[in-house]
Amino acid sequence: MKRMISACLRFEAPDLWLAVPAALFPVLVSEVTALMAATEDDPEALVLLPGVGMILTVVLCCVLGVVYLCSNFPLLLQFSASRRGSLAGLCLHILRMTVLAEVIAAAATMALGAVNHGFFPRFAVGELWRGIPVFVWPICAVLPVLVGLVWAGVLTRF
């Protein structure tokens, strides 16, 4: 278990080439849809867009995480040989990549929101993050890793 956790939680340079595009694609999609929603003056759509962007990032990271593990065989060999150990390692690795991508996506969206607010005050897309309470951000950053650790521990223990 210790070897699997250290293998999964280590932020390696190859992970960044996978996590950065996975994070920036939903950000660009969210920004374009937010600009389209802002032109139609639909405030309810602007509140839903951050959640849709986060869900899109998680799904994309799950798919790319499996592809990454299939192409990175040495990391896959560090997982337990049992079926439960492999599943736990896969869940932990995907959740780690998802957290990294969510942090990159949140930073990029806030930066794009600030740029949009400065240049296009009528289409203040950065204000769409205003609808999410402050306590949700730490939960979004920490909860996937904690769930992955607990899930990996339960699967390898029983």
Predicted regions and their residues:
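Hydrophobic alpha-helical transmembrane segments of membrane proteins
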Residues: M1-P74, R83-F158
